[in-house]
Amino acid sequence: MGKDTIADLLTSIRNADMNKKGTVRVVSTNITENIVKILLREGFIESVRKHQESNRYFLVSTLRHQKRKTRKGIYRTRTFLKRISRPGLRIYANYQGIPKVLGGMGIAILSTSRGIMTDREARLNRIGGEVLCYIW
């Protein structure tokens, strides 16, 4: 039985966001590095650094906390992450069938033959792949 590193990454980010933690530490793999780079590029994460501890590499990510002011006071915006394709049920989509998350407001992360990319990049390159997760 294998370990789902993508689900571990998303759960760590979700838990840190809910508990108002500033940083997240996850095990570094090629897939998690590429997903974190996409989150950094899209503005969900402020910064990322690679940390070595006893022959294992970890990614230490600083989360971006946005505060908005309303009549009732200041509240934090939440980042929603949802795992779509999982080890027990893989979900694939061609470039025409790539779903738009919240009508284009969110992003879908895909694993394609040209690497891990967002739904917009996959549509521009006209390639499909495995839908890993939704982020909005």
UniProtKB/Swiss-Prot annotation:
GO terms for biological process: translation. Signal peptide: none annotated. The gene is rps8. InterPro entries: Ribosomal_uS8, Ribosomal_uS8_CS, Ribosomal_uS8_sf. Part of the 30S ribosomal subunit. Keywords: Chloroplast, Plastid, Ribonucleoprotein, Ribosomal protein, RNA-binding, rRNA-binding. Belongs to the universal ribosomal protein uS8 family. Pfam families: Ribosomal_S8. It comes from Oryza sativa subsp. japonica (Rice). This is Small ribosomal subunit protein uS8c.
